[in-house]
Amino acid sequence: MWNSSDANFSCYHESVLGYRYVAVSWGVVVAVTGTVGNVLTLLALAIQPKLRTRFNLLIANLTLADLLYCTLLQPFSVDTYLHLHWRTGATFCRVFGLLLFASNSVSILTLCLIALGRYLLIAHPKLFPQVFSAKGIVLALVSTWVVGVASFAPLWPIYILVPVVCTCSFDRIRGRPYTTILMGIYFVLGLSSVGIFYCLIHRQVKRAAQALDQYKLRQASIHSNHVARTDEAMPGRFQELDSRLASGGPSEGISSEPVSAATTQTLEGDSSEVGDQINSKRAKQMAEKSPPEASAKAQPIKGARRAPDSSSEFGKVTRMCFAVFLCFALSYIPFLLLNILDARVQAPRVVHMLAANLTWLNGCINPVLYAAMNRQFRQAYGSILKRGPRSFHRLH
């Protein structure tokens, strides 16, 4: 069983004497990569003007949780695996356990907020700026930390060193049923909700794309001479300008059009997100109501030629957010399944340690995903690394 007295801080076992060096090496990589990557991410969000959006505060919050883990907690995990002994006492073992689960819960809650934001952006664009207003998003971010700490603080007396994973965690036996409920809420309900949101986003995008294709065909059949203008007469577009959200002003070139666009904001800052995000019902209504004369008189809308690129940007940002969620879920699934299927710890201790060490990945992988899947983050990272200390002048 995962049980030990508070005075026992040893996780020594002959079967893991060789494996501990693998764990230590992996832990050092996670600590260094995660610290550097997450610091770069925070600097990029602060320095790059196009990344300074309210929605990107969610990314900053996720980054802070990862930075807390990689910089403060991971070195102690490495030390414990190296010596197979927790060397910093019972009190800090409790602090470690509380911060460990608090950072994980903040990450899960933030992933939920990101998925919710992407869904509202495409399905309920008028509701998006209301939910993610300046006050709303600050309240949401503060709430993630308050809820995360408050939910695991009651376990303070039962945080111990769990020998089978050589980590300070809560005592599984003494923590029941509270810990079982908490794990179910965060890892089952929370992560499932994120997955459902992305499924809904995919379905909405697919429907919108079909509706747009039908609309274009309708417009082409009405007047063949205006085929080139069908994209310019699209039934709606999302323009994501954070400054206009903050001021409450109308989007450029939209107020005079028969179909209003939803002004929103995303991880891409000032980029527009178009086309695929159209509501299918609105597209069909527009196709049915638009007479030939209206089509013939349709005038180009400023920025409409960027629609395909903007639509692509929405897809790229959403895929990046989904990749972050997927990596988090995949890093924890083996650990969670092993704890459920092997509650009596019959499997070799090395297997439990491998599963636990895989969860370290979620603390350092996000900056890699941002760099690989987001052009603006990639450029910001490059600029900071090239300019060095001179990059900080942009903060003044």
UniProtKB/Swiss-Prot annotation:
GO BP terms: neuropeptide signaling pathway
An example molecular function term from Gene Ontology annotations: urotensin II receptor activity
Keyword line: Cell membrane, G-protein coupled receptor, Glycoprotein, Membrane, Phosphoprotein, Receptor, Transducer, Transmembrane, Transmembrane helix
Composition bias, Low complexity: 247-260
Family (UniProt): Belongs to the G-protein coupled receptor 1 family.
Chain positions with Phosphoserine modification: 221, 224
PROSITE patterns the UniProt entry points to: G_PROTEIN_RECEP_F1_2 (PS50262)
Gene3D superfamilies linked to this entry: Rhodopsin 7-helix transmembrane proteins (1.20.1070.10)
SS bond partners: none
Its biological purpose: G protein-coupled receptor that responds endogenously to dietary fatty acids or nutrient, specifically medium-chain free fatty acid (FFA) with carbon chain lengths of C9 to C14. Capric acid (C10:0), undecanoic acid (C11:0) and lauric acid (C12:0) are the most potent agonists. In immune cells, functions as a pro-inflammatory receptor via 6-OAU and promotes the expression of pro-inflammatory mediators such as TNFalpha, IL-6 and IL-12B as well as stimulating chemotactic responses through activation of signaling mediators AKT, ERK and NF-kappa-B.
Listed name of the protein: G-protein coupled receptor 84
